[in-house]
């Protein structure tokens, strides 16, 4: 592998309906087996359901949901001497978004509604109101980091 230069991150094309890069990224997180059009249908239907229930703009609710799910710290395993410590570390902005989207989708998949669009809509509504499984996941990660604050000096 050549060591000459660092390859920059690729620009993602905005989604066709709302022209949002964030939404395009979210579509890619939802997508399974390369079925992008199915993922787009799920997201757009979920956004319509959300806009119906709350009289706000589609993307503002998604933004609010992701803001409430984004973690600021996480723990990473670090082996020191013969024991492994859970060391709290700050999360980079790109990873924050990625984790928030992943947790939102995972929480939606575990819900009980009939279609994935309804599950996703429900989870987005819950997350925008600071409740739901995805927000609980973020709280757990923050609690874990708080509990292991004593090992923060092992940070790298």
Curated annotation (Swiss-Prot):
**GO biological process, alphabetically ordered:** translation
Pfam annotation, one family: Ribosomal_S7
| Domain of life assignment | Bacteria
What are the GO MF terms of this UniProt record? rRNA binding; structural constituent of ribosome; tRNA binding
Q: Which Gene3D superfamilies did the record assign?
A: Ribosomal protein S7 domain
For this UniProt record, the keywords arranged alphabetically read as follows:
Ribonucleoprotein, Ribosomal protein, RNA-binding, rRNA-binding, tRNA-binding
What do the Gene Ontology cellular component annotations say? small ribosomal subunit
PROSITE patterns under this entry?
Answer: RIBOSOMAL_S7
What is said about its interaction partners and assembly?
A: Part of the 30S ribosomal subunit. Contacts proteins S9 and S11.
Q: What is this protein's function per UniProt?
A: One of the primary rRNA binding proteins, it binds directly to 16S rRNA where it nucleates assembly of the head domain of the 30S subunit. Is located at the subunit interface close to the decoding center, probably blocks exit of the E-site tRNA.
Family the UniProt entry places it in: Belongs to the universal ribosomal protein uS7 family.
Give the protein's recorded name.
Answer: Small ribosomal subunit protein uS7
Identify the taxonomic lineage of the organism of origin. Answer: Bacteria, Pseudomonadati, Pseudomonadota, Gammaproteobacteria, Alteromonadales
Gene giving rise to this polypeptide: rpsG
